[in-house]
């Protein structure tokens, strides 16, 4: 247990940020999963819609520091390539 006031504050801040990051990461995974499921179902129109919705979520997660910018770029690139193979 923390003994200093500043350490107690840091613990609270960490818990708050962890919860916020967990929510962003969960949302991110959900949107990525929607794109992959649409691609697996060979539904090009749905996959394109899902990709268009997923890209801003991925970029937001990167700008908030939840994921690295390279990770965001890699995800967007791979998902775009996947959707483009559907035609």
UniProtKB/Swiss-Prot annotation:
HAMAP family to which the protein is assigned, alphabetical: Ribosomal_bS20
Transmembrane feature ranges: none
GO biological process: translation
Chain intervals with Basic residues compositional bias: 1-11
Record SUPFAM superfamilies: Ribosomal protein S20 (SSF46992)
Function: Binds directly to 16S ribosomal RNA.
GO CC annotations on file: cytosol; small ribosomal subunit
Region (Disordered): 1-23
GO molecular function per UniProt: small ribosomal subunit rRNA binding; structural constituent of ribosome
Stated family: Belongs to the bacterial ribosomal protein bS20 family.
PANTHER family: 30S RIBOSOMAL PROTEIN S20, SMALL RIBOSOMAL SUBUNIT PROTEIN BS20C
Protein name listed in UniProt: Small ribosomal subunit protein bS20
InterPro entries reported for this sequence: Ribosomal_bS20, Ribosomal_bS20_sf
Alphabetic keyword roster: Ribonucleoprotein, Ribosomal protein, RNA-binding, rRNA-binding
